[in-house]
Amino acid sequence: VACAAALATLPAAPARAQAHADPHWAAKDTGTTSVRFRGLSAVDRRTAWLSGTQGTVLRTTDGGAHWRNVSPPGAADLQFRDIEAFDARRVVVLAIGEGEASRVYRTDDGGATWTESFRNTDAKAFYDCMTFFDRRHGLAMSDPVDGRFRILSTGDGGRTWTVLPDTGMPAALDGEAGFAASGQCLVSAGPKDVWLATGGAARARVLHSADRGLTWTAADTPVPAGDPARGVFALAFRDRAHGLAVGGDYRADQPSPRSAAGTGDAGRTWRPAVTPPPAYRSGVTWLPHRRAAALAVGPTGTDLTTDAGRTWRTLDTGSYDTVDCAPDGGCWAAGEQGRAARLEN
């Protein structure tokens, strides 16, 4: 289930702004059309990191005018689905997959050299996403192992990792898993709060921990599930209370009603969007400096909300898998065929 989103391949459509007052995506040439980027970390308006298929990691420090291939050596067979940057030089990247395909790499010199800091040795584990609370503390999550989601923890910025006990993790539902679609199935806000998105089971749930992954509570969402291709694919929290969930059915020939939901109580309850995005969405991010504004992206377009997820409207029809905004307001998107873009006003 975790890799199911990789099967969604739709042709890219030209990006175009829908209204003069709205921001728009400005495409940035990454120098490749063969890589699908599902990992993205926005540092600021000038600096961003991308990760994807073929073991690829790219970095720009000039607003996307130029991209440097800083891929770890010997990783061409890996899929880097999540990347978390601390700045222009320090970054941690997650490779997903069964068994030893799930790995974590870290660089402290902008990708000139890399250290493999974790390699999964449990054939039953499949890591999907990771998140950092600060420069030291972070978590990664795996699909259920022996009936419970597995959590990996670091306290030194991703240099070493430890599997946490699963005693505080609720039992997974039959068929439940995470979607490694955009690096946003595990997200955090503040020093200790973290949320995990699921799909594939009878109900699409969001699990919440307020103690950095030691104990968790589960809540149902209105996003449809009941199929390995359906559920919550991405989360975004602007603080520990207010969050957004997006997803649906990744299959291009299937509808995705109720593709978005929101919470105002740290994920204890979720309300469906009154006017959701018109199709499956794989990535979501809040816009800094605009309290109630957020973007959702997917293979068929980008949607904008200005009322904290109650209503969404189409902003762009280009194909993107993931989206991220930096604290300075710099927003980036990336996806199939080497696509990358920066949001412009």
Feature locations, PLM:
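Secretory targeting and sorting signals
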Residues: 1-17
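Residue-level hotspots at or immediately adjacent to binding/recognition sites across diverse folds
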Residues: 18-345
